[in-house]
Structure formats: C-alpha cells, structure tokens
C-alpha cells in the first residue's frame, strides 16, 4: 500500500513539475478521457463528457501515454464516410467538399481534404480532413456528420451497412 502511495506521490510531483496538462485541458489516458478538473499530489480528477468524475492515480498517469487534446488552439477533424461501390464517387467527394467549405467553424486557410481512404469489401471509405478550433471540435463533427448523411440521402449516395443473408435449408 505504501509503495502505491509513494508512486502516486512521485507521479504527482512529476506532473506538477513537467506540466503535461493543466486544469481545463481535455486529455485521453488509456480507456479514460475527459476534462482535467483538479491536479492533486496523489490523484488527478477528470470529468468525462457524460459528467462522470474519474479519479486517476498520479502514479498511473505518470507512467502512461497522455494525449493532451486541449493543448493546442486548433485540432484536425477527420471524419470517415463509406459509400457503396455503385455510388458516384466524384459526386460524393464534391458534396463532402461543399459541406466542409460551407461550415463557418472550418478554418479555411488550413488544408481541407476529401480523400479515398480505402477500398473495402463492401464499400469505398472516404475521409474528410479539416481544421477547427479545439473548442469547436465536437459541435462541428456532429453537424458535419448530420449534413453528410442528409446530402448523401438527397443525392442518392448509398451508405452501406452490414447485412446478413439467411438461407433456410430443409
């Protein structure tokens, strides 16, 4: 027990000295992510997006990979969309590009891309890449996803989903 407390104390000292994050930053550590609420000597408290409080031992934190999402003012927003092989690829890319460029939260002087990410078994996976202010990330992502779906529906672009054919043998 003392070994664990000493590890948490040492981790707390390291966090306070090296400052890999600060109160208010949004971090990802292992299976946990949230906004840093307090940094104490033994524990760091996060609040998750669904308002749960997570107490992470500083010993664990100091020995983990920490992704500090809130450290920078801007964040790249990557969204994957799949279309059917029979859908018009050029039209789908044009629609995605138009939607991104029409969104006021997108930083227009940074690179905006619509690419074919992969050719999969049952679909063509496209990806959009654009930059937003970190605080606009989630709202912009949700808005873009809804707009992508709506425009694909209006223009007959199929979004495939997994299907299972069941054959009954008598």
Task: Write out the residue ranges for each language-model feature.
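Conserved small/polar residues in nucleotide/adenosyl-binding loops
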Residues: 1-5
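Short, structured beta-strand/loop micro-motifs enriched in basic residues and often containing a Trp
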Residues: 6-15
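Hydrophobic alpha-helical membrane-association signature
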Residues: 9, 95-96, 140, 144
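Soluble accessory domains appended to multi-pass membrane transport proteins
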Residues: 14-109
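Solvent-exposed, non-transmembrane regulatory segments of membrane-associated proteins
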Residues: 69, 87, 107-170
């Amino acid at each position: 027990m003392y070994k664990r407390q000493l590890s948490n104390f040492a981790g707390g000292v390291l966090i306070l000295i090296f400052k890999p994050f600060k109160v208010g930053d949004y971090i990802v550590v292992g299976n946990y992510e949230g906004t840093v609420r307090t940094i104490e000597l033994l524990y760091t408290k996060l609040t998750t997006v669904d308002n749960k409080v997570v107490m992470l031992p500083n010993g664990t934190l100091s020995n983990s990979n920490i992704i500090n999402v809130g450290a920078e003012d801007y964040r790249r927003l990557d969204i994957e969309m799949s279309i059917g092989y029979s859908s018009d690829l050029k039209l789908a890319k044009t629609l995605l590009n138009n939607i991104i460029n029409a969104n006021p939260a997108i930083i227009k002087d940074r690179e905006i891309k619509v690419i074919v990410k992969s050719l999969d078994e049952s679909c063509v996976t496209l990806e959009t890449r654009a930059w937003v202010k970190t605080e606009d990330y989630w709202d912009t992502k949700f808005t873009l996803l809804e707009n992508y779906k709506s425009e694909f529906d209006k223009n007959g672009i199929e979004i495939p989903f997994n299907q299972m054919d069941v054959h009954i043998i008598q």
